[in-house]
Amino acid sequence: MVKLRLKRYGRKKQPSYRIVVMDSRNKRDGKAIEELGFYNPINNETRVNISKILQRLSQGAQATKTVKNILNKAQIVAEKNN
């Protein structure tokens, strides 16, 4: 199953995350199919590619709970509620 997930990067105790499309069976920091944006919880900064996210959701990708929350804060409606 393909999911929109967070992939961690950054330094120790200073996490940053990339919003990526990847298979749910891959490791958290494994190879991603596509990068769609990033999220920095320290600065509360978010940048996303809205058109690609909506395209992936329409193709059947499911967003994780955390990614749904980030998209809701960025005022992008996650259409899939699974």
Swiss-Prot record:
It is found in: Plastid, Chloroplast. The keyword Ribonucleoprotein applies. Its main location: plastid. Keywords: Chloroplast, Plastid, Ribonucleoprotein, Ribosomal protein. GO terms for molecular function: structural constituent of ribosome. It holds the Pfam family Ribosomal_S16. The keyword Ribonucleoprotein applies. NCBIfam families: S16 (TIGR00002). Belongs to the bacterial ribosomal protein bS16 family. This is Small ribosomal subunit protein bS16c. The lineage of its organism: Eukaryota, Rhodophyta, Bangiophyceae, Bangiales, Bangiaceae. The gene is rps16.
